Curated annotation (Swiss-Prot):
The modification N5-methylglutamine is found at residue 230. InterPro entries: PCRF (IPR005139), Pep_chain_release_fac_I (IPR000352), Pep_chain_release_fac_I_sf (IPR045853), Prokaryotic/Mito_RF (IPR050057), RF-1 (IPR004373). The lineage of its organism: Bacteria, Pseudomonadati, Thermodesulfobacteriota, Desulfuromonadia, Geobacterales. Gene3D superfamilies: 3.30.160.20, 3.30.70.1660, 6.10.140.1950. It is found in: Cytoplasm. GO terms for cellular component: cytoplasm. This is Peptide chain release factor 1. Methylated by PrmC. Methylation increases the termination efficiency of RF1. Pfam families: PCRF, RF-1. The keyword rRNA-binding does not apply. SUPFAM superfamilies: Release factor (SSF75620). Peptide chain release factor 1 directs the termination of translation in response to the peptide chain termination codons UAG and UAA.
Length: 355
């Protein structure tokens, strides 16, 4: 294990040198690629360097045990350092787990109202605000790509791109069915209604990922409807693209420019097709392992938001928090961190069982 990390440490030092090279800095695509590799390695190398320091300090304190005057202090230090060594050992094992190649990617977020009619659409809007505020806290960029608004507020469907560092890594476990329990404003008897929305987090496709034959596309243009000012319904700016082999359909009318709408629709189309391919691969892997991939089942009911009790429960890991207001305001780091830790431990367990 440590031979591998030492090789990675040499690579890390090479990257630090390359990133200060003016030639590399001038080549922005290469600079971004190397910066991403450097950022991916940094946590492991930092943990490894702390681990080596702890080993050196343990050795020094072992030698101090022979000194009667220093023995008691050395024993305390050995106890503390042994715990730190154990913690770092576990941290390094997790950091050495195979990386999800999508973790550093931007994402396409899709939220769709499900059962519950107007209340479900309102909750779709609540979820979109929650993710938007979480994105703000992480300094990510959110761009609306497409939406279908409900008459009473919220969205029947909303699609957005989220760009920034580690977006997919933090949000990938949000895919699934989100259930809400609350009293609608129109409910005179005060009865609690249950409704649901589905969330899909898809790693954004890059041009190298998927090659789409233009002959496989059916492109329709039409006049946009809804918000958009004086240009609405005056030009055929809205675009609908159908990928004939898969039947995938994407429409976009958010921009006044047909060219921009077409580019946004293509971005979503490529991402959906790539996501379908990856979902099929994940399903096969899960079947081979005879276990369900936690981030893969979009039909899985993953979470309940109970407004009368101010409670959020994530059913996959049994996490319950009684601070629903702050969660809906985008404070979901505790949830995303707990999910990542859970699935990392599952991966470690699977790795040790397969060793």
């Amino acid at each position: 294990m440590f031979d591998k990390i030492q090789d990675l440490e040499i690579r890390f030092q090479e990257l630090e040198s390359l990133l200060s090279d003016p030639t590399v800095i001038a080549n922005q695509p290469e600079f971004r690629k190397l910066s991403r590799e450097h950022a991916d390695l940094a946590p492991l190398i930092e943990a490894f360097r702390r681990y080596k320091k702890v080993l050196d300090e343990l050795e020094e304190n072992q030698e101090l045990l022979a000194d009667p005057e220093m023995k008691e202090m050395a024993e305390e230090e050995i106890s503390r350092l042994s715990q730190e060594k154990e913690r770092l050992d576990a941290e390094i094992k997790i950091l050495l787990l195979p990386k999800d190649p999508n973790d550093s990617r931007d994402v396409i977020l899709e939220i769709r109202a499900g059962t519950g009619g107007d209340e479900s659409a309102l909750f779709s809007g609540d979820l979109f605000r929650m993710y938007s505020r979480f994105a703000e806290k992480n300094r990510w960029k959110v761009e609306m790509l497409s939406c279908s608004e409900s008459e009473r507020g919220g969205y029947k469907e909303v699609i957005a791109s989220i760009e920034g560092q580690d977006v997919y890594a933090k949000l990938k476990y949000e895919s699934g069915t989100h259930r809400v329990q609350r009293v609608p404003e129109t409910e005179a008897q005060g009865r609690i209604h249950t409704s649901a929305c589905t969330v899909a987090i898809m790693a954004e496709a890059e041009d190298v990922d998927i090659d789409i034959n233009p002959a496989d596309l059916k492109i329709d243009v039409y006049r946009s409807s809804g918000a958009g000012g004086q240009h609405v319904n005056t030009t055929d700016s809205a675009v609908r693209i159908t990928h004939i082999p898969t039947g995938t359909v994407v429409a976009c009318q958010e921009e006044r420019s047909q060219i921009k709408n077409r580019a946004k629709a293509m971005k979503v189309l490529k991402t959906r097709i790539l996501d379908t391919i990856q979902q099929e691969q994940n399903a096969k892997l899960a079947a081979d392992r005879k276990q369900q991939v936690g981030s893969g089942d979009r039909s899985e009911r993953i979470r309940t938001y109970n407004f009368p009790q101010g409670r959020m429960t994530d059913h996959r890991i049994g996490l319950t928090l009684y601070r629903l207001d702050s969660i809906m305001a985008g404070d979901i780091e505790e949830i995303t961190d707990a999910l990542r830790a859970h699935y990392q431990m599952e991966a470690l367990k699977a790795q040790s069982e397969g060793a």
